[in-house]
Swiss-Prot record:
UniProt organism field: Ostreid herpesvirus 1 (isolate France)
One GO biological process term: regulation of cell cycle
Regions of compositional bias (Acidic residues) in chain numbering: 373-382
BIR repeat start-end pairs: 291-357
Protein name listed in UniProt: Putative apoptosis inhibitor ORF106
Lineage: Viruses, Duplodnaviria, Heunggongvirae, Peploviricota, Herviviricetes
PANTHER family on file: DEATH-ASSOCIATED INHIBITOR OF APOPTOSIS 2, INHIBITOR OF APOPTOSIS
Keywords, comma-separated and alphabetical: Metal-binding, Zinc, Zinc-finger
Amino acid sequence: MSRPIEWSPENGAAVCLVEEYNYPMAIRCYKCNVLFDITGLPYTVDAFIEKHDSITSGMEGNQCRIKDLGDDWKKGLFSNFFFKTELSDTEEKITCTNCVWSRNVLKNSYYTRGMIKYAHDNESPACIIKNTEEMKTSDSWQYGNSCDVNFMQMETPFKKFTNKSVICSSCMTIIAGRDEHPTFGGFVNSHFINNPHCKDMDFLKNLSIDSRRIVVIANLDDFPDYNSDTSSSEGESSVGDEITYYNADEFTEMFGDDSDDDSDDEGIEDLSAYDEAMSVNDVDYKDVKERECSFSTWPKQMKQDSKEMAEAGWYYTGKSDRVRCFHCGITFGGWMPDDDPWSIHKLMEKETCGWLEFNPDKIPKVLRYIDDEGGEDKEEDGGGGGVIEFPKNNKEVENPKRGSCKACYERKADIAFIPCGHVFSCNICTMEMFASYKKKKRCPMCRVHVEKVQKIFLDEDEDMA
């Protein structure tokens, strides 16, 4: 199969990129983000541009027309993108010289600079390279140990937290150095991903831009030691006295190694002090489109659809598979392939979420009757109050049949919860209730933990009348 031509500034094709999706070959426009299939098209730039313009012309509100853009604009799309490439016998390592983002590709494999740029910009959104005009003509980016601006001697909010991480004293965000030689820009980028709302973020970005063409390798020993500065007032933040401080061993033991993305997360993960502090309404993600965009770096192996996740109120935190509700602030990780975003949200909410109340029809029927306020998952043992209350004016349940399922009122209630023994629902509704509930399954009547379920068989005389 013939390959598309190399898209370079010289041939005016920098406006799009070629990517592997569910199509044999697809193109995404940098300007309007439209993705379209080019299977069967001639492998020419003009054919791709014509296909793009024909699609966008039929899209309401999309005014992007590549053919109307000047060549200078097209060529400029590549000019602010600089990587150092290290060659080995079998592969090339393409590395961003500012944030240490990297991508390994097989030697002699087909890829364009556009592909690499797109991957970088999505996985490292805070990297300043794509926003710095003075770097457009430079090819001299190299790692360095010195710089006109010595960040380590300047008063920054970064302090050494462990041998591999720093902590921002303004917002208490912990930033791990994920590379053997972390850079100052890399710490700023990771900080932006984890907490873009830090009051010192603009200050940090400006410092990072001042690095010019030299990338500062961050020696963690040059940062002030956070653990020894217990009485300093610099570390005050909006968290106040509620924040809990951990030493390095306690932090690793409680929260694990952030670099392990394959950890067996189960249900709601134990939240760090930062997660607890941020469990509030996030107005920046109140727009469903903003939430959907946050899933641009969602792990490819995850089966949940980004649009459905966004509609259910979730946005991606950028860490492992952890997501957060923009409205109630609940955080969840450890998604299974068949987990439903709406069901998980309902089952995991600590308090009644206004977003779920606003979208009651999206929640599976059997989950709408669970009263979480009387039986939150805060207790480790036994049940707690919170008996199910059913709507009295529901036409479907005005005259329920004897022995019918308390969720659908259509089938027999033939599933017993062990050990409490309550018979509440039918087999189908029970599966729907527990399919997305990975741990701490509770009886919806008495809130006792359900260890197992048992199908029961009723005599014909006891069948529904």
